């Protein structure tokens, strides 16, 4: 294995990142590029787990506007993450990266059910594992899923790959030209400064299990590899 900072990672991809400029659905050139970026890191010998969101297919707010019950809207969102996971699996395997999808909601015809020990074994056998379906329960975000699964598989770090966002700022840099980018933070810093990075449940899980996470721009080629190799890009948030 190459000289790297993190040997087992949890990569969190937003659904919107797969849509690219289209804003909705899956953009084939974009998901192909994401798969190639993952392969570049995989070739270093890194064990890679992935959680992908579903915002490119379904937003909970859309359900709320329709008067839909929150739990029902969340279940639709979970199915959206599974569609994204299968598409990403197909793109990864088409370029020679062995990949398994595990879902928190059983659908054995298309994916394995989530089993922690089996997921870890896949990683040890040099297979990428994509966790889909969220936690399997409504009211929990895919950020929380990433933090939970990262703790369960003993990941070294969570890589928060953002669509066009290169780190954490003191304010929205698009609205405030005086916004300052942070290179290093702690979870308590995020809470005390009121920074909107991930939901409080995900943040608490990361802090309680002392799992660092790195927020960086997915759209810049090679960034996933740079984070894994320890290059100082984006914002690193320490668990404690």
UniProtKB/Swiss-Prot annotation:
Pfam family of the protein (one): AA_kinase
Quote the PANTHER family the UniProt record gives: URIDYLATE KINASE, URIDYLATE KINASE PUMPKIN, CHLOROPLASTIC
Q: Which HAMAP family match?
A: PyrH_B (MF_01220_B)
Residues bound to ATP are: 12-15, 55, 59, 163, 169, 172
InterPro entries documented for this protein: AceGlu_kinase-like_sf (IPR036393), Asp/Glu/Uridylate_kinase (IPR001048), Uridylate_kinase (IPR011817), Uridylate_kinase_bac (IPR015963)
User: Pathway, according to UniProt?
Assistant: Pyrimidine metabolism; CTP biosynthesis via de novo pathway; UDP from UMP (UMPK route): step 1/1
Name of protein: Uridylate kinase
Question: What is the first-listed, main subcellular location in coarse terms?
Answer: cytoplasm
Annotated catalysed reactions: UMP + ATP = UDP + ADP
The gene it comes from is pyrH
The text of the family note is: Belongs to the UMP kinase family.
UniProt GO cellular component terms: cytoplasm
GO terms under biological process: 'de novo' CTP biosynthetic process; UDP biosynthetic process
Q: Which GO terms describe its molecular function?
A: ATP binding; UMP kinase activity
Q: Does the keyword Kinase apply?
A: yes
């Amino acid at each position: 294995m190459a000289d790297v900072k993190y040997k087992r990672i949890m990569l969190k991809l937003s659904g919107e990142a797969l849509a690219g400029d289209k804003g909705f659905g899956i953009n084939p050139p974009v998901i192909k590029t994401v798969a190639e970026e993952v392969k570049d890191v995989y070739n270093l010998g890194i064990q890679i787990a992935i959680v992908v969101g579903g915002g490119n297919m379904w937003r909970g707010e859309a359900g709320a506007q329709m008067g839909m019950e929150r739990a029902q809207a969340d279940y639709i969102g979970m199915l959206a993450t599974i569609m994204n996971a299968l598409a990403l699996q197909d793109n990864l395997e088409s370029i020679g990266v062995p990949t398994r999808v595990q879902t928190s909601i059983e659908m054995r015809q298309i994916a394995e059910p989530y089993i922690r020990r089996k997921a870890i074994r896949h990683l040890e056998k040099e297979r990428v594992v994509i966790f889909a379906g969220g936690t399997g329960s409504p009211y929990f975000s895919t950020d929380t899923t990433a933090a939970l699964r990262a703790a369960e598989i003993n990941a070294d770090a969570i890589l928060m790959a953002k669509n066009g966002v290169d780190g954490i700022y003191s304010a929205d840099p698009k609205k405030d030209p005086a916004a300052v980018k942070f290179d290093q933070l702690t979870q308590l810093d995020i809470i005390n400064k009121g920074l909107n990075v991930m939901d409080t449940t995900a943040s608490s899980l990361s802090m309680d299990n002392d799992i660092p996470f790195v927020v960086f721009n997915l759209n810049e080629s090679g960034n996933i590899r740079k984070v894994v190799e320890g290059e100082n890009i984006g914002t690193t948030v320490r668990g404690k």
